[in-house]
A protein has these predicted regions:
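Hydrophobic faces of well-ordered beta-strands that scaffold small-molecule active sites
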Residues: 31-35, 80-84, 113-115, 136-138
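Short Fe-S-cluster ligation motifs
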Residues: 68-86
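N-terminal [4Fe-4S]-dependent radical SAM core
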Residues: 1-34, 54, 75-77
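Conserved C-terminal portion of the radical SAM core fold
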Residues: 79-82, 134-135, 162-172
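Canonical radical SAM enzyme core domain
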Residues: 54-68, 89-133, 140-146, 166-170
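Short glycine-enriched, charge-decorated loop/helix-capping segments at active-site entrances
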Residues: 51-59, 150-163
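Short loop/turn motifs at secondary-structure junctions
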Residues: 44, 77-78, 109, 132
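Canonical Radical SAM [4Fe-4S] cluster-binding loop centered on the CxxxCxxC motif
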Residues: 21-64
Length: 172
């Protein structure tokens, strides 16, 4: 289904997944938004297009994000989830905190907030403690710290795995 959103058409799934011989059922229109807040990253992962990117600042606008979320709702499209990603979001943690603050307003507080992080920086740990997150994905591509350091192309401090004060039920 195409929905006119401020003069641009967005495609929104109209039916749920068909299970066996069951007929398809209509679903209410919804979207998940992926918000890349920066290309900058503290790691140099061999497999990542953002590996070691130095560009930290982003032309990202928090008021524009809030306006889009509200506008989609007004257009009858439910914003189910906002995924905050990067690069590494914690390299622009003040911006991410502004997003969380804006998404805590009554008209946006029903949107699921998700963080994707490598969790290696002290500010990553601080961001993960924020109560507005509904879920958090932490990229741990190996259980062995030495091998993980090789994959990430940087040394990993033991403090990176200090989850004190972080709601582990939100961590994936």
């Amino acid at each position: 289904m195409l929905i006119d959103f401020r003069g641009k058409y967005i495609s929104v799934k109209e039916f749920d997944c068909q299970l066996g011989n069951q007929p398809k059922a209509r679903i209410a229109p919804f979207v998940n938004l992926f918000v890349k807040v920066t290309k900058g990253c503290n790691a140099k992962c061999l497999f990542c297009s953002n590996a070691g990117a130095l560009e930290v600042q982003s032309p990202f606008s928090v008021p524009k994000l809030i306006d889009i979320v509200k506008g989609l709702k007004e257009a009858g499209v439910r914003v189910s989830r906002v995924n905050v990603t990067g690069g590494e979001p914690s390299v622009v943690s003040p911006l991410v905190e502004d997003i969380l603050s804006g998404m805590s307003a009554p008209e946006t507080s029903d949107v699921h907030m998700h963080l994707n992080t490598n969790g290696l920086l002290p500010q990553s740990q601080e961001l993960m403690r924020h109560p507005r997150w509904d879920s958090i994905s932490m990229s741990l591509h190996h259980y062995d710290t030495k091998k993980l350091s090789e994959l990430y192309g940087c040394s990993i401090a033991e403090s990176a795995f200090g989850f004190e004060g972080i709601n582990l039920q939100k961590l994936n």
